[in-house]
Swiss-Prot record:
Main location as per UniProt: mitochondrion
Similarity comment: family membership: Belongs to the mitochondrial carrier (TC 2.A.29) family.
Catalytic activity: NAD(+)(in) = NAD(+)(out)
Segments traversing the membrane: 34-51, 85-105, 117-136, 180-200, 216-236, 269-290
Bilayer topology: Multi-pass membrane protein
Protein name (record): Mitochondrial nicotinamide adenine dinucleotide transporter SLC25A51
UniProt keyword Acyltransferase present: no
Positions annotated as Solcar repeat: 28-108, 117-201, 214-297
UniProt record, GO biological process: aerobic electron transport chain; mitochondrial NAD transmembrane transport
Gene: Slc25a51
Amino acid sequence: MMGSEAHDKRPPMLTSSNQDLSPHLADVGQIKHYFCGCCAAFNNVAITYPVQKILFRQQLYGIKTRDAILQLRKDGFRNLYRGILPPLMQKTTTLALMFGLYEDLSRLLRKHVSNAPEFATRSVAALLAGTTEAILTPLERVQTLLQDHKHHDKFTNTYQAFRALRCHGVAEYYRGLVPILFRNGFSNILFFGLRGPIKEHLPTATTNSEHLVNDFICGGVLGAMLGFLSFPVNVVKARIQSQIGGPFQSLPMVFKTIWIERDRKLINLFRGAHLNYHRSLISWGIINATYEFLLKIV
């Protein structure tokens, strides 16, 4: 009887302990999506930044890959990683928000709008996460200025670039916000909506290395597709954000100017898209594989 009583008394003690720990475990579970997104971004930027600089030059000036590489060689190795701080800050924070907010908002919407289709709640969560990411537009703005060789003589680091914009008012930091909002919302909806279905069509993974390969392929395919589809928007964004001061031009107006400058040819508008395709393939492969790997071990 004593053994039976002791056995009967243990469960309440364990239940109480679990109740005390459950809020802390829930906090860790929620934070890990932000942490894993941040680490995935850091890993990606450190590896792919030089390729991003080549791509940026092509988007801004409509030049060939070889000419963009020659520009970077002329700038010297010392300037190769010039301007990496803004994208490092921007990408780590952006991807932390992208993955973390998407999970939090999806959970929140499912809880309060339980009768809505899952696809709808996840799409809204992805759109809201993308909109929130746009708060970090100033970092993307400064990155654009630091990568443009026309501004090399005006400032040499992130702090100086921020100071150069300050005298033009807060709005100057958010020049190019509209194309960023459009790009983020569109890309997030498709990324989170298609990530699961694409992975389901890949061969079944039985080992950790196979899971890593599948996650890389899934992220890479999505990244390449979205990078190609949003390429014209990024071309317009680069042109808008390379300007300091002056009137704020609308997205259609800037697009029309670029379209005329590039002889009204779609192939000229997509100059650099092939490099962007390969960069996005590698970048989002790294991001998705790193994110999913960290989720399993954190």
